């Protein structure tokens, strides 16, 4: 693993500003999740709102990605491309993933929303995925925590509920760069990773599947789906390790 950056107080404040805008945008975008709405409508709102508040949507153009945000429905694990012909239906579970650049620094967050009413299984998945993220964040704030402890905490919760943890995608350091060191694995693994240091800033963003953990990428080169067609859910925050534990940097002001 390459050297993990320790951010200064000023850098953390700038990431917090970007994270707050991302969080505020996410809340408003989530209010648009209703049957009959296209994912493109939601995405256009995200782009417009971000620009209005002097931010930049980091996804647009990143390695050729064509939209402002990733909007992933049901069996889509991540990187769902918003489209005019993708119309939300009653019972759809929807992840909206927003990364905002403000003053040169990134804030990255995502959350789950439901169009109409979710099935009991879908709601359990959504709630479990959120708990997985929360427990991963909690593990990162424990004394002498290592990065591998995050994945162990997440895996324990998923196993308890009979769900699986996606291994093909992971969390990451963040700051001036969208994706920096370290790579944050969300599953239990044997790698003896470094201790988490005060000033390390990174995302915790587990993707939890009802079925098996395997994924595949569709022909558009971006959209990742579960191999077995089962539902998937994800929540994400950007956090910083502090002397007292951790602070979530992607909260609304």
State the predicted function of each range.
Residues 1-253:
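Active-site neighborhoods and metal-handling regions in enzymes and metal-associated proteins
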């Amino acid at each position: 693993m390459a050297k993990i950056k320790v951010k200064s107080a000023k850098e953390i404040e700038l990431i917090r500003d970007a994270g707050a805008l991302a969080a505020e945008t996410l809340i408003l975008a989530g209010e648009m999740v209703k049957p009959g709405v296209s994912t493109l409508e939601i995405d256009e709102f995200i782009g417009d709102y971000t620009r209005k508040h002097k931010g930049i949507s980091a996804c647009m153009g990143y390695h050729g990605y064509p939209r402002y945000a990733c909007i992933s429905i049901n069996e889509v694990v991540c990187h769902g491309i918003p489209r005019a012909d993708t119309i939300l239906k009653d019972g759809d579970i929807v992840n909206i993933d927003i990364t905002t650049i403000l003053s040169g620094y990134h804030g990255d967050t995502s959350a789950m929303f439901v169009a109409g009413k979710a099935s009991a299984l879908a709601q359990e998945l959504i709630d479990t995925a959120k708990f997985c993220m929360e427990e991963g964040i909690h593990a990162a704030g424990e004394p002498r925590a290592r990065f591998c402890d995050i994945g162990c905490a997440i895996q324990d919760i998923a196993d308890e509920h009979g769900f699986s943890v996606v291994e093909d995608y992971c969390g990451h350091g963040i700051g001036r760069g969208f994706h920096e060191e370290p790579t944050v694995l969300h599953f239990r693994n044997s790698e003896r990773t470094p201790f988490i240091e005060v000033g390390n800033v990174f995302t915790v963003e587990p993707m939890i599947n009802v079925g098996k953990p395997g994924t595949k990428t569709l022909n558009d080169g971006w959209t990742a789906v579960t191999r077995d067609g089962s539902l998937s859910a994800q929540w994400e925050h950007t956090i910083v390790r502090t002397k007292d534990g951790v602070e979530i940097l992607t909260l609304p002001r």
